[in-house]
Design a protein with these regions (language model features):
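Winged helix-turn-helix DNA-binding recognition segment
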Residues: 41-108, 159-223
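Charged low-complexity intrinsically disordered patches
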Residues: 118, 198, 202, 223-237
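Short recognition helix of helix-turn-helix/winged-helix DNA-binding domains
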Residues: 1-67, 105, 112-177
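Hydrophobic transmembrane signal anchors and adjacent membrane-proximal interface regions, especially
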Residues: 33-34, 190, 233
């Protein structure tokens, strides 16, 4: 895995893939949830100092986001009706509360499962998803399921790095994550996992070495875009 010194990461919460209540949600809804729960800026002062007006704390120290539908459709490169539909799915599953604000963008309160709000000092289990997989045009057409699968593969690979004990005959570090595991976490047909892996291989994010028991997986971080212009996120079909 390449040096992650210049990488920034978004948090993709694990309960979206392990709790049966949320597993059937659309992959794009889960990625939208990751965007609106981004918590790099936890105070109004920090947000203002860094010219980031998307994250705030209310009078009860609850985190909320301010994103217009136009902002969100630009980030995910989908239509405004799609954003409205994705938000509706999050609301119906108890993961989002939207408070209307007169003459301003609505407040978006991302929620943890079972009616818990996010607070400033929360620590959560999550998969790390590199920002550059959205920012770099090289990856703009990767499907939503492939992006979420990549986050899972990356987490498994990081565990191999931590354990420092999973090496092949060429002394290269690898991880194992079966197609059945991915299919179960993403709530998809097992046959689709092969397509996902092929897409990640084609993009240079994954290398696969067939093995009798389970494929050996080698995960690479995405290339960081050196273009200073803000790129739109594109989530493929």
């Amino acid at each position: 895995m390449t040096n992650e010194e210049n990488q920034k990461f978004t948090k993709l919460h694990k309960f979206l893939f392990t709790d049966n209540k949320f597993k059937a949600m659309k992959a794009k809804s889960k990625l939208l949830y990751a965007i609106i729960t981004e918590r790099q800026s936890l105070t109004i002062a920090y947000a203002k100092n860094n010219q980031d007006q998307s994250q705030f704390l209310d009078e009860n120290n609850r985190l909320f986001s301010i994103y217009s539908n136009s902002d969100l459709k630009g980030m995910l490169h989908v239509s405004e009706p799609t954003i409205i539909s994705l938000k509706k799915e999050l609301i119906e599953n108890g993961l989002l509360e939207e408070i209307r604000v007169p003459n301003a963008n609505n407040r978006l309160y991302p929620k943890k499962p079972y009616d818990e709000y996010f607070y400033a000092n929360d620590l959560d289990e999550f998969y790390r998803l590199p920002h550059s997989i959205f920012d770099n045009p090289k990856y703009k057409k990767i499907a939503a399921d492939s992006i979420t699968a990549y986050a899972i593969y990356l987490s498994r690979y990081e565990y191999s790095v931590f354990k420092d004990s999973f090496y092949d005959k060429e002394n290269k570090l690898y991880c194992i994550c079966t197609n059945e595991e991915i299919a179960n976490l993403l709530n998809i047909d097992r046959r689709k996992v092969a397509k996902i892996k092929n897409e990640l291989v084609a993009c240079g994010l994954l290398a696969v070495k067939p093995s009798l028991r389970a494929d050996l997986l080698y995960v690479s971080l995405p290339e960081v875009s050196h273009d200073k212009e803000l790129k739109k996120m594109y989530i493929g079909n």
